[in-house]
Amino acid sequence: ADKAASGVLTKLPQKQIQEMKEAFTMIDQNRDGFIDINDLKEMFSSLGRTPDDKELTAMLKEAPGPLNFTMFLSIFSDKLSGTDTEETLRNAFAMFDELDTKKLNIEYIKDLLENMGDNFTKDEMRMTFKEAPVTGGKFDYVKFTAMIKGSGEEEA
């Protein structure tokens, strides 16, 4: 696994590695260099979600060993290389869609983007959602991911 993991560092652009480092650091709540079940619990809790231990354990089992940054990169490298990015994006939005409506409150999404991770500015927010499918304050993330990935598919 170490060979595969170190190969990831040479495959990904530096900017992407830096973005992944920021994501890893955000998830690694106790800053010990590893993502464990407690880190995941805290992260999801800060997002207003409470997945059970079984779900969290399943996530962690994707790694063949302790989930340090190199392993984190290794696991996500295929997704980052574009193999299933539309699905990955849709799934990321779906994590916040507890009722599975395929739509999210646009103000909630904006709040997350302003206050978590990269902390979008008002201008970045305006540009991101300029063409976004928003009706009645609801952001249609399935249409949005199809639109930005160019598949033209409206349904999963």
Swiss-Prot record:
Keyword annotations: Calcium, Metal-binding, Motor protein, Muscle protein, Myosin, Repeat
SMART domains found in the cross-reference section: EFh
Ligand binding (Ca(2+)): 28, 30, 32, 39
SUPFAM superfamilies for the chain: EF-hand
Coiled-coil spans in chain: none
Entry-annotated residues carrying Blocked amino end (Ala): 1
InterPro entries cross-referenced by the UniProt entry: EF-hand-dom_pair, EF_Hand_1_Ca_BS, EF_hand_dom, Myosin_RLC
GO molecular function list: calcium ion binding
Domain EF-hand, residue spans: 15-50, 84-119
Single GO cellular component term: myosin complex
PROSITE patterns in the record: EF_HAND_1, EF_HAND_2
A Pfam family the protein falls into: EF-hand_7
Keyword DNA damage: no
Role: In molluscan muscle, calcium regulation is associated with myosin rather than with actin. Muscle myosin contains two types of light chains: the catalytic light chain, essential for ATPase activity, and the regulatory light chain, a calcium-binding protein responsible for Ca(2+) dependent binding and Ca(2+) dependent Mg-ATPase activity.
Other noteworthy facts: Smooth muscle myosin from the scallop adductor muscle contains two kinds of RLC proteins, A and B. The calcium affinity of the smooth muscle RLC is approximately 10 times that of the RLC of striated muscle.
Protein name: Myosin regulatory light chain B, smooth adductor muscle
Native species: Mizuhopecten yessoensis (Japanese scallop)
